[in-house]
Amino acid sequence: MQPKLTAKEVVFISDLMNLEESVAKKATFYSKTLTDATLANEMKTIACNHAKRYAVLLGLLQ
């Protein structure tokens, strides 16, 4: 069972979620537009890592 979060903590987590989502979207976009395969794969990895962090943060709010 997770402890109750304060309103300030919820706002902080929500802000972090917005940032993680934004970076994941940007990295996904870059992975599709880069012509260098190595850089494109690195951007895919970065996007995946940020998506995982987003999911973890979402889990804290549920």
Regions found by a protein language model. Give the residues of each.
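His/Met- and acidic-residue-enriched segments that coordinate or traffic transition-metal cofactors
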Residues: 1-62
